[in-house]
Every structure is written in structure tokens, then in C-alpha cells.
Amino acid sequence: MPDIDTCPICVESPLEDSTTFNNIAWLQCDICNQWFHASCLKIPKIEVNNLHSYHCEGCSKSHGPSIPKRKSKRSKVQIDYVALNDGDVFAVDKSSHPHVDKFLSFEVNANEIDDKINPYIDFRKDITADYALDTRLTRPVLIPRADLDIVDMKLPIEGKEITIDYIANEVGDDTPLDVMDVLTQQGVNPGWNLGKWRDYYNTDELSRDRIRNVISLEISDVDSFGKSFRRPRIVRDMDLVDKVWNDKSPRPKVTKYCLMSVTGSFTDFHIDFSGTSVYYTVCSGSKTFLMYPPTEQNLDIYTSWCLQPDQNYMWFGDFTKAFKGKGCTPSGGFKVTLSPGDLFIIPSGWIHAVFTPEDSLVIGGNFLTLMDLSMHLRIYEIEKVTRVPAKFRFPMFNRVLWLTSWYYYNNKSQFLKDLGQDAHIKNEAHIKSEAHSRGEVHTKTETHAVKDEPQPDQSVQYKTLSCLVSHLQSHYESSKINKVARNTIPAGLIGKDIPGYLAKLQSWLDELSP
């Protein structure tokens, strides 16, 4: 048994060495006086700060559990002078974000549903583009401990070997980094570099001065890290930019992000830019999402919430807005926690907040799909109404849409396929064939043969193309007085006669009219 000044949990492989000793926090049992590394006990920082007396596992059997501090309206908090200096009197306690308590107390937990069919999360072993097109992904998809061969995803090295030191070494210590202050939900100014972030991340949880988060390090051009990482097959098959980008300028860099979050990190409710779908694989640590589906009611409430001048002070889940004559709050919400090795797919438009229970490293990315084009445009309009800064929107979104129109105008069969309509035809044909073999379908005359052939659902095609054409027509009108909008139109590809090109798209749309 080690002496009381040595942590007994990691005695075989000591946590601290000469370079980390001063950065590690300790807890002492008030009964036996044994010292422990706080991180070895895996007690979240927020709980450590609330302890009056710690009892180790052995002593708690005879002396009862640890004793929390007495709660009082006059209890002291760690004053967040940075937030106060910025004029934010809401975030006064810098040990955790003010919304974390409500997040953690949210009761509906998708991980705890025992029903055969989970109403919140689609738990699977694999996911393909065909499955996505068939189901329209009405629920997020979680593949626990995903088999990389099955989902056809490749990590640069084993997930458990992807550490903050590995990332800093591969990407480079001097790489500029956007760091978010969790308490204020604002970027840290002046910015950091990756070397400084690595040192902060490696600091013991209890010794960190503030909670900070990194969620926007794009790594697709990093040689041995990003370039050797292969996104899941479903993402590569459905990514709209992959299909349509036919441009000399660099494509939007949103495909591969490295997210580095410390314990207690919290990102308030948001929708990913332009309603992009998201893939998310956890290398280490864990993440908890609180999610709401993109129903018309929820999106309407979300838009109003974003427009509130005191939005940062308001918990989205409690926000009330009149919808169709009734006072409504967001509905259909649930929590889900991801563990190392999990692959998570968030469909287009989902409203979500994210909490980090323990230090975590994640690789993920965003992608547009033809299937979700109407939702992408719906969220794009919400971003305009709520005045989301250009920095936080999908880069070159309008150029992508012009290129999308050109690609599918010249590849109309692919338009059917990418909407899942060719599968619809094959499925209908198969059903009719099976029924015919059972004698349930009479032989048709030659006159009716063509009429009875299975046809694609034109309403799906029409709705998708209609919202695209409408958006491009509106964008073209804006381009007449807005140089930035004008420069996003790929005239070198579609020609300088933009009205003529739009007329061709309109004719195609008219052909699809149900």
C-alpha cells in the first residue's frame, strides 16, 4: 500500500512527473488522510468544487458518503471578471456555464430507452446512402463502437492514440486557432496557436483558469492527419459539394474538423451552418447532446429565441412563443451521450446543444445533400433573419447552389438517383412483379402498359427543384445591385446569359409539375 502522500489509484503508472507535478490537483480523504489525484477519481470539476468533505471509497462504507457544501443564497462563486468586463453580468460564476445545470437535469435520455424501436435515436451497425434516402433520416443515427471497415471510414492512427500531443505535432504548434470562451460563448481575443492550446489542454482540470473550447480546426489539408483520414462512406456518397464542385477556386473547407474540448465545455443551442448534416466520431472522452427535431414549430421558436436581445440569458428549452395561436415551447427534445469509437450522424436542421463531461477529442465534419436541399434553404433564410455573421455560415453557399443547378440540369438521371427516386422505381417494380407472380395482377393490354409502369414521385423532384430555382432567381436579382452576390455566379460555366439559363431551369421545373 503506498503512503498517504501518493495517489493509490495510479501507483503502478504515476500520473505526474517532473513536468506535470505542479499542474495536477489533489483531494484528501478527511477520514484516513489519504491523498488522491482528482483526475484519477474521475470526479467532475463542478462536483469537486461543491465538496465540503471528501470520503474515499473505503471510508465511505463506515462514515457515509462525501459531504457537499451547504447551499446558501449567499454562497460565494468564482467571479468571472472577463465576462463582467465585457458587460455580461449573467456569466458571473466561471466554474461552469450557467445553462449546464438545466442541461444535465433534462430528463429524456435516449441512451436509457429499452424499447425495441428507440423513438429518438436510430441505433445501427451501419448506415448507407440508400438507407438515408429510403428513411429520409428522420432521427439521428448512432453507431456504437463503429466497425471502421463496415462504415468504410479510416482514421490516421488508432482512435485511442490520437492525443492532443499527436494533433499538435501533426498540425504544427504555430497553427492559429479559434478558441471559444465557454462562459461568454465568444471567441478568445487575441487568438491562440495550437502549441498554447496543447499546454492548456494538458493542464489538470482543477488548475485551468477558465473553460475554453476548440470546435473549428479544419484539417483536410494536413498531410498525415487530415489527408489520411477518410470520411464514412455515406458522407462521401451524399456530399453535394463532392458531386457538383466544378470550379478553379478552392472548394469550401468544412469536411474534416478536429474538435478539442475540455471537461465542462458547453456549446449553446444552434443549427449547423445552412442546416448541414454532420458526422461525428469520438476518439477519446465523451460528448452529450441535447437535441430538438427541426419541426416547423421548433424552428419558429428557435428563430424567435435567436432574435432576443438577452438570448444568452435564456434557456432555449424554456423559451415560449405563440405558434398557431398557442403558447409553445420546444418539443421532442432528448439527450444522447457518445463514447469513444461511436459514429454519430446528425441529419439536416437539428437544433442542438453540446456538453463535454470529460476531456474529449473528436473528428467530424459537415456536408450538404440534395435530399435535404429544402431544409438547407430554410436554415439559410433563418440565418439571414437572425443576422448570423458571414464567418459562421457555409462558405460559398450560393456558388455551390449555382453549380448544383448546372450539374443536375446536365445530369437529370443523377438528379433522380440522388433523391432516391430511382430506388423508388425499382422498389415499385419489384412489388408489382411479386404481386403478379402471385396472380394478384392481371395482364395489362399494350395500351395500358406504359401507364402502369412505376413512376418516380414527381412531388419530391418538383419540391427540390422548385426551391432551388426560386432561390437562384432571387439571388440573381440581388446580384444586380450587389457585387459580392454577382461574383458568386459561375458565369464562366453557365454562360453570361443568366436570365436565359434560369429560363431553362424553369422549363425543366414545369416538366416536373405534378
Curated annotation (Swiss-Prot):
It is found in: Nucleus. Residues 220-384 form the JmjC domain. Histone demethylase that specifically demethylates 'Lys-36' of histone H3, thereby playing a central role in histone code. Fe cation binds at H270, D272, H352. Residues 432-456 are annotated as: Disordered. The keyword Aminoacyl-tRNA synthetase does not apply. The JmjC domain mediates the demethylation activity. It comes from the Eukaryota. Residues 432-454 have a biased composition (Basic and acidic residues). Its cofactor is Fe(2+). Belongs to the JHDM1 histone demethylase family. GO terms for molecular function: histone H3K36me/H3K36me2 demethylase activity; zinc ion binding. Substrate binds at T267, K287. Keywords: Chromatin regulator, Dioxygenase, Iron, Metal-binding, Nucleus, Oxidoreductase, Transcription, Transcription regulation, Zinc, Zinc-finger. Its EC number is 1.14.11.27. One of its GO terms (cellular component) is nucleus. Its main location: nucleus. A zinc finger (PHD-type) spans 4-62. It catalyses: N(6),N(6)-dimethyl-L-lysyl(36)-[histone H3] + 2 2-oxoglutarate + 2 O2 = L-lysyl(36)-[histone H3] + 2 formaldehyde + 2 succinate + 2 CO2. This is JmjC domain-containing histone demethylation protein 1. The lineage of its organism: Eukaryota, Fungi, Dikarya, Ascomycota, Saccharomycotina. PANTHER family: PHD/F-BOX CONTAINING PROTEIN. InterPro entries: Cupin_8 (IPR041667), JHD (IPR041070), JHDM1_Histone_Demethylase (IPR050690), JmjC_dom (IPR003347), Zinc_finger_PHD-type_CS (IPR019786), Znf_FYVE_PHD (IPR011011), Znf_PHD (IPR001965), Znf_PHD-finger (IPR019787).
